[in-house]
């Protein structure tokens, strides 16, 4: 970045890249630590009231620029019985982040990613079951790999997938949480 200090546009671009790389590194480190805590039964749940639609949209906002830069369409739908739920918001956000991150990573230019939150009545009166979905028209995965997707550090090894950066930690965390 120092070499381009005379070009504000390039400097801004490089600084943004540095920021994104730093955020990605922090996310990777946090994922490794979370996985270690989960596997050692040291995960603590932090339940609080969540405005589920707002929290979900905030999570998706982290990926909006990345999706836009790839020409991807990122849509959100909600069908809620109760706008507020009692949930472990940090871990729910982590699950959503990992799912959407993978969808954006593995969906090509011009692809579509559909995210949704739906609720159905729960077993107890006044309660509901909340379902988060993330669907895309990305490159997909082989039938063989589908059996291993939730194993920590597992990544499909094909020429198409190998071009995509990732640690293979995210889906292991999703499964365990």
Predicted stretch roles:
Residues 20-25:
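Short alpha-helical segment of the dimerization/phosphotransfer core of two-component systems
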Residues 36-47:
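Helix-loop junction within the histidine kinase core
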Residues 46-61, 93:
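A conserved beta-strand-to-alpha-helix junction within the catalytic ATP-binding
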Residues 46-51, 68, 73-83, 118-120:
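Conserved catalytic submotifs in the C-terminal HATPase_c
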Residues 65, 139-140:
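Glycine-rich G1-box
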Residues 103-104:
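Short helix-loop "hinge" at the ATP-lid/N-box region of the Bergerat-fold HATPase_c
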Residues 110-126:
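Short beta-strand/loop element within the Bergerat-fold HATPase_c
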Residues 141-153:
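Short conserved segment of the HATPase_c
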């Amino acid at each position: 970045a120092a070499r381009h200090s005379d070009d504000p546009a390039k400097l801004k671009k490089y600084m943004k890249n540095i920021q994104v790389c730093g955020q990605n590194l922090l996310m990777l480190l946090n994922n490794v630590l979370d996985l270690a805590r989960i596997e050692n039964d040291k995960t603590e749940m932090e339940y609080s009231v969540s405005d589920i639609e707002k929290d979900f949209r905030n999570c998706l906002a982290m990926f909006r620029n990345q999706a836009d830069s790839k020409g991807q369409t990122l849509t959100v739908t909600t069908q809620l019985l109760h706008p507020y739920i009692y949930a472990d918001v940090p871990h729910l956000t982590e699950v959503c982040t990992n799912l959407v991150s993978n969808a954006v990573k593995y969906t090509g230019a011009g692809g579509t990613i559909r995210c949704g939150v739906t609720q159905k009545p729960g077993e107890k009166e006044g309660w509901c079951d909340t379902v988060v979905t993330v669907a895309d028209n990305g490159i997909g995965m082989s039938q063989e790999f589908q059996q291993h997707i939730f194993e920590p550090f597992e990544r499909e090894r094909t020429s198409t997938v190998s071009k995509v950066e990732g640690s293979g930690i995210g889906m292991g965390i999703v499964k365990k949480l």
